[in-house]
Amino acid sequence: MLQVNNVGGVTKVSFEPDSKLNLAQASEVKAEFVNIVKGTGGRMELDMKNLEYVDSSGVGALLSLLRLCREFKWDLTLMGLQPSVRELFNLLQLHTIFKIK
C-alpha cells in the first residue's frame, strides 16, 4: 500500500493510486510505518495525493505515525492532501499537530 524511496537523505513515502486509509487497511499501514521509522531518525515526507479517503481508523494510523516519528526523532511532513482529506484534517484540527505542505 505504501511506496518508499530515499532521495537525498529524505525518506519519501507515498500511497499507491486510489488508496483508502480505513479500518481494512489501518493495521497494515501502521505495520509498514513501524518498519520505515524504526532505527535512526531523519526526514520523512508522506505524499498523500493518492489517498482518496480516510476514516477514523486511518486518522489513528496517521497519529500513530506521528507518535513514532517523535519517538525515533523523525521530522514528518505531510504533502498533497486531497480536498476531502484536508477538510477532515481541518475539522479535527489535525493541521495544528501535523506539519503540512
Model feature map: region roles:
Residues 33, 65:
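Aromatic/hydrophobic pocket-lining residues that form π-stacking "cages" and hydrophobic walls in ligand
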